[in-house]
């Protein structure tokens, strides 16, 4: 670092020289010390394993700017995976990990995070030109808003991963702001023009303050933006659109897919399909079973569906009762970098739209796994809703079947099998009934 400070060598030149010597464990925190002009507010962040935190790490990687991060200890509700730091450790100046309450949306946990961020920021208030906050976890936008109030010149970029105020089933999310003074002070701050938008729902307030005061607003797709604006008047819609940027989740480079070697075994002569992800109310084991069912009924037997998910009694009960379990292998969810490596072993990766027909006017979601799948050597088999963002995506290696066009599952699979030059049927795979 002394050589850099004296101007004898640039940081990039020094890193390149160290790498040329075969040095892999470079202490980037020392090289980056004091360089961050951007502050990232991410309540949940690596090394704690969470989709939102991982995407934030990928945003930092994509942006290529050195940053400081203020996050929170999440050990009570999230597992730790130290390898996740490999995504962006080379761009980290410092990370302050707070010890506030840990919760998805409790007001106590939000207050603790705000207080911790304000305390940390005041020690380095002249350091930053920009801050970036990302939701999910509403804590991040609340803290960013408080910093914006005390430093209006700092650029605030606020990202929304999904619609915030309603969930995938269009149920209202509600978590009370348990501080009447905060609500009244906020109403006074926004003024009479917007005070009616402020209530005691932290999810609503989180969205409103970001819409009004962030300098840039990041959405993952146009339908998400349009859906979130439906409840606002034309003035706010125009304000938000003037600051909106559409940006799908970043994809990591190929070397990240080789960082952890998986020793998972697949039969090379079979067509190996994989599903990675949690099961939810609108996406569960039934979708996997239907793929196996309609392939089997089309006289296709040379395939295995490898499922990596949050195994629990309910899921395993469905699996054990399935007539098609011979074609499905259940596995516990894999750590992030092993998951990336596993994708390369497969012939196709399954991805499903959230089902929103009859629930929402259009589908405002893009499955987060798509960005990781794009970097894999494998093909992607997407099961879509009509006219969703995923349904309208055209890419090499992407095969699309509408979720409820069950009779087309086999034809899409046969096209995939033909493209990878594997048989769809083998006599040795015939299952004899007991």
Predicted regions and their residues:
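N-terminal subdomain of nucleotide-sugar transferases
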Residues: 1-90, 216, 295-298
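N-terminal strand-loop element at the rim of the active site
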Residues: 65-115, 125, 310-314
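A short, active-site helix/loop in glycosyltransferases that binds the activated sugar's phosphate group
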Residues: 75, 197-243
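Short N-terminal targeting/anchoring amphipathic segment
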Residues: 121-139, 152-159
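Acceptor-binding helix/loop patch of EC 2.4 sugar-transfer enzymes
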Residues: 157-200
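Nucleotide-activated donor-binding/catalytic signature segment of Leloir-type glycosyltransferases, i.e.
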Residues: 192-193, 300-345
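Conserved donor-binding/catalytic core segment of Leloir-type glycosyltransferases
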Residues: 255, 264-283
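Nucleotide-sugar-dependent
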Residues: 283-286, 339-341, 349-374, 381-391
């Amino acid at each position: 670092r002394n050589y850099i400070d004296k101007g004898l060598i640039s940081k990039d030149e020094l890193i390149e020289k160290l790498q040329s010597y075969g040095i892999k464990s470079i202490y980037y925190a020392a090289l980056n010390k004091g360089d961050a002009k951007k502050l990232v507010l991410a309540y949940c962040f690596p090394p704690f394993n969470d989709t939102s935190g991982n995407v934030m790490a990928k945003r930092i990687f994509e942006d290529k700017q050195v940053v400081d991060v203020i996050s929170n200890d999440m050990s009570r509700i999230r597992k730790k995976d130290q390898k996740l730091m490999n995504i962006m450790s080379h761009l980290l100046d410092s990370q302050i990990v707070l010890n506030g309450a840990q919760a998805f949306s409790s007001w106590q946990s939000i207050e603790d995070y705000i207080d911790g961020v304000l305390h940390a920021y005041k020690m380095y208030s002249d350091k930053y030109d920009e801050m970036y906050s990302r939701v999910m976890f509403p804590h991040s936008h609340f803290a960013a808003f408080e910093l914006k109030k005390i430093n209006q010149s700092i650029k605030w970029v606020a990202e929304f991963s999904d619609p915030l105020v309603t969930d995938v089933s269009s149920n209202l999310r509600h978590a009370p702001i348990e501080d009447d003074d905060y609500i009244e002070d906020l109403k006074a701050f926004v003024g009479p023009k917007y005070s009616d938008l402020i209530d005691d729902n932290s999810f609503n307030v989180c969205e409103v303050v970001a819409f009004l005061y962030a300098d840039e607003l990041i959405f993952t797709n146009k339908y998400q933006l349009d859906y979130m604006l439906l409840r606002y008047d034309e003035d706010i819609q125009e304000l938000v659109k003037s600051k909106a940027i559409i940006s799908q989740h970043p994809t990591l480079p190929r070397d990240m897919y080789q960082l952890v070697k998986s020793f998972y075994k697949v039969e090379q002569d079979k067509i190996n399909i994989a599903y990675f992800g949690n099961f939810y109310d609108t996406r569960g084991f039934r979708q996997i079973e239907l793929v196996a069912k309609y392939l089997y009924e089309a006289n296709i037997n040379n395939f295995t569906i490898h499922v990596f998910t949050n195994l629990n009694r309910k899921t395993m009960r469905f699996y054990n009762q399935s007539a098609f379990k011979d074609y499905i292998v259940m596995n516990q969810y894999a750590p992030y970098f092993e998951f990336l490596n596993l994708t390369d072993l497969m012939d196709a990766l399954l991805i499903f739209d959230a089902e929103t027909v009859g629930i929402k006017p259009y589908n405002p979601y893009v499955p987060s796994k798509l960005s990781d799948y794009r970097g894999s050597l494998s093909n992607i088999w997407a099961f879509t809703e009509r006219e969703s963002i995923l349904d309208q995506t055209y890419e090499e290696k992407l095969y699309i079947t509408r979720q409820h066009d069950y009779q087309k599952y086999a034809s899409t699979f046969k096209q995939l099998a033909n493209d990878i030059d594997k048989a769809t049927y083998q006599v040795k795979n015939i299952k004899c009934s007991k």
